[in-house]
Structures are given as structure tokens and as C-alpha cells.
Amino acid sequence: MLKEFPHKNLIEIDIFELQPSQFFVNEDKVNAVSSFVNSSKDVVIPIIKKDEMIIVLDGHTRLYAASMKGIKTVFVFDTETEQYIYDFVQEAQRRNIKNVSDLKRLSHEDYEKEWYSYCDNYIKDKKGE
């Protein structure tokens, strides 16, 4: 038996209106998802809205692949998140990451080193507070 999930209202939006909550994309993952990202209908992104921002919670790689293929819009749906995401967005903005075109594409090894290092340090800092 298949599990049923609640229906989500999808909204089509310009990809450059979306604020990333990450800083990097993994080159290997970009190459992998590029094979199935061919139109805006192939990209559905969970988001939250805060003030004037529309924040990407997941799907940064799909979003990046779409932008590389010249896809201008994707579909999004509202969901919920934990408080930490706002810290990640603040750090992204500090790094001048305001939209998908600002994400840094890194090799798999560099991605794991950079992203996991940031996350580990974030967790350590939060535990120390």
C-alpha cells in the first residue's frame, strides 16, 4: 500500500526570487540531477516565507541545474522548518548569496569538506551557547 501525503498547493515562481539557505552545490549531484531537470515542471522546491524573502529549504541542486539549463521558473510549496534555517540564510546573505546564481559549485570532495565543516561548527557553536 502506498502512503498518501496531503495535497500541496504549487506556485510557479521566478528562480531568482528565491533566497538559498545553503552556500554550495555538489558538482557530482548537479551532473546527476541535470539528466531529469528539463523544464520548470521537473523542479518542485519546499520554501518558507519570512518578511520579503522566499527561502529555499531543500532542492538547491535541482534549482542550480535548472538555472544552468536556462529554466526561468520552478514550482514551490510552503512548508515549515526549524529555527536554524534563519541562521543559515543570514550566513548565506553575509556571503553575498542572494539567489541561485550566487551558489558556489564545488567538487564532491570540496563540497563535503566545506558544507559539513560549516554545519559541524554551527552545531558546536549552538551547543556552547
What are these regions (language model features)?
Residues 53-129:
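Basic- and aromatic-enriched surface patches that contact anionic nucleotides/nucleic acids
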Residues 2-57, 61, 67, 72:
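Short alpha-helix boundary/capping and kink motifs at helix termini
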